[in-house]
């Protein structure tokens, strides 16, 4: 009894601490939000000038990350919304809507009256009813210098059949946040986690909300069991059995004044209705087998064929008090919820190129240790180096690591350590984090994202696809355009700061239909 009482008391203490921190963050961020609300209102005034929907063919979108890429439920289309771009001095936020036709390989820019305000790090979920609906919740807006943030708590729906935006107002929903995750479960949207940040404070969440698509009402769920600790940027997917898997993510905590320590989570949990009741949920800790991804943040997720969850890229940051360095990834993993097992996704290479090669390493035994930021097997990876000359003359070197070929989405057996036939896979997307992923007709599409070259952030605008049934080779649909790679050195001058404010959103007062910008 004594131990149980202490445990419950400790739990209540943690809840009180979290409540105090949220109140503190809310108070300090209110002034910042008031400043940014005025800027957001200015851009909404510009957007209000649109009176009719205009669809025009266009070149591929400009570089960005932390946008949403969604699959149209009825057409051969991918829908890109929002995102951000940083050029070293200015933070740009977007609320543009692009449609990519996967069959025709064409882009269309769709300007719709009264769209959601500019944002990034939001969540977008497509449901089939009514000819298709795209539901968008939350995300963030940043000041031009990227030092102040406004976190949205609004809910929008894009009616795909009529191409109209609608803001859905309902009380009792989640607080303002970004980096959260949201999935469609039956006729509900289930939302988990995220974070809220002001200039000096931040808070991470592990709460769960449900939005009913029939009654348009929010409800906060209180699952039993031990669930994930507060985090953002996790994997969240629905299993064929009707559960919801949450994996990984990122959070940080203050260890001393002005010093924060980040945590890359690698644990997995299952959220499911208890006893079949949709009003009562339970968390269960999971321990999947197989070849797991190395701990990382900034990875991207999509649903693959056979109800598998696809996991791509990310970054493993090594944090010190005065510096931050990271290793970026372009590897693929599949999680099979039916077998509760991870698989590495490796390319087989074109069938026309047949070589005999020995596999570099076997699958690690379950529970085996792996390096925190990845590591090579016996057969070393092949590294391709590509130099891109930006418009300003800067040479950006892209290093791409190709792993040894193997089976995709299947466990490795000891027999597979013998000689096998495989070709060398073609180069695909370079290592990156915060990319946009979507799967349509068994084909994976990877768009944009970012990586770092020294002190420079390179934001991408390339588009690649991979047939997940064949797993032979990547195909580049849009190459990275050097002319879009602008990087300005940091400046502390007030004059430059004033110039930046006019550039936020990427539009002038005279033209509200051009590019805008964002920050995660």
UniProtKB/Swiss-Prot annotation:
Give TM regions: none
**Per UniProt, which keywords does this protein have?**
Kelch repeat, Phosphoprotein, Repeat
Keyword check for Cell cycle, yes or no.
no
Identify one Pfam family in the record: Kelch_KLHDC2_KLHL20_DRC7
The domain of life is Eukaryota
Q: Where is this region: Disordered?
A: 1-33, 346-379, 402-431, 481-520
Q: Where are the Kelch repeats?
A: 77-129, 133-187, 188-241, 243-289, 308-361, 443-494
PTM Phosphoserine: at which residues? Answer: 413, 418
Q: Where is the composition biased (Basic and acidic residues)?
A: 11-24
Annotated Basic residues bias: 1-10
Query: By its UniProt entry, which PANTHER family does this protein fall under?
Result: KELCH DOMAIN-CONTAINING PROTEIN, KELCH DOMAIN-CONTAINING PROTEIN 4
> What's this protein's name?
Kelch domain-containing protein 4
Organism (species) = Homo sapiens
């Amino acid at each position: 009894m004594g131990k149980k009482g202490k445990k419950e008391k400790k739990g209540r203490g943690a809840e009180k601490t979290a409540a105090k921190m949220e109140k503190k963050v809310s108070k300090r961020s209110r002034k910042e939000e008031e400043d940014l609300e005025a800027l957001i209102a200015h851009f909404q005034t510009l957007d209000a000038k649109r009176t009719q929907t205009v669809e025009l063919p266009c070149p591929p979108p400009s570089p960005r990350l932390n946008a949403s890429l969604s699959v149209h439920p009825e057409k051969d289309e991918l829908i890109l919304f929002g995102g951000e771009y940083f050029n070293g001095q200015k933070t740009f936020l977007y609320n543009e809507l692009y449609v990519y036709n996967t069959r025709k390989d064409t882009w269309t820019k769709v300007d719709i009256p009264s769209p959601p305000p500019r944002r990034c790090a939001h969540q977008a979920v497509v449901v089939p009813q009514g000819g298709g609906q795209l539901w968008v919740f939350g995300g963030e807006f940043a000041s031009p210098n990227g030092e102040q943030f406004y976190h949205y708590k609004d809910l929008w729906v894009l009616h795909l059949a009529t191409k109209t935006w609608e803001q859905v107002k309902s009380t009792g929903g989640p607080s303002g946040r970004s980096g959260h995750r949201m999935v469609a479960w039956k006729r509900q949207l289930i939302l988990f986690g995220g974070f809220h940040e002001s200039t000096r404070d931040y808070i991470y969440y592990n709460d769960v909300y449900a939005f009913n698509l029939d009654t348009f009402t929010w409800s906060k769920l209180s699952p039993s069991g031990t669930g994930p600790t507060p985090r953002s940027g996790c994997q969240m997917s629905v299993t064929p059995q009707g559960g919801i898997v949450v994996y990984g993510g990122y959070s940080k905590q203050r260890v001393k004044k002005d010093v924060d320590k980040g945590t890359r989570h690698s644990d997995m949990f299952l959220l499911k209705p208890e006893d079949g009741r949709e009003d009562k949920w339970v968390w269960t800790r999971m321990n999947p087998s197989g070849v797991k991804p190395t701990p990382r943040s900034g990875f991207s997720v999509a649903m693959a064929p056979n109800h598998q969850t696809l996991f791509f890229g990310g970054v493993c940051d090594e944090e010190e008090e005065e510096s931050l360095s990271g290793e970026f990834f372009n590897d693929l993993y599949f999680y099979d919820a039916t077998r509760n097992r991870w698989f590495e996704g490796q390319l087989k290479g074109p069938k026309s190129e047949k070589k005999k090669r020995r596999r570099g390493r076997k699958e690690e035994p379950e529970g085996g240790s792996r390096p925190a930021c990845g590591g090579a097997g016996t057969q070393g990876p092949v590294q391709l180096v590509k130099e891109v000359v930006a418009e300003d003359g800067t040479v950006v070197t892209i290093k791409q690591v190709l792993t040894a070929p193997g089976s995709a989405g299947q466990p490795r057996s000891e027999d597979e350590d013998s000689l096998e036939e495989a070709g060398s896979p073609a180069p695909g997307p370079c290592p990156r984090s915060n990319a946009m992923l979507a799967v349509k007709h068994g084909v994976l599409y990877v768009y944009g994202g970012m990586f770092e070259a020294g002190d420079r952030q390179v934001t991408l605008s390339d588009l690649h696809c991979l047939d997940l049934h064949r797993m032979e080779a990547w195909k580049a649909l849009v190459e990275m355009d050097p002319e879009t790679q602008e990087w300005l050195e940091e400046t502390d001058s007030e004059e430059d700061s004033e110039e930046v404010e006019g550039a936020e959103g990427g539009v002038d007062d005279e033209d509200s239909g051009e590019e805008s910008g964002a920050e995660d």
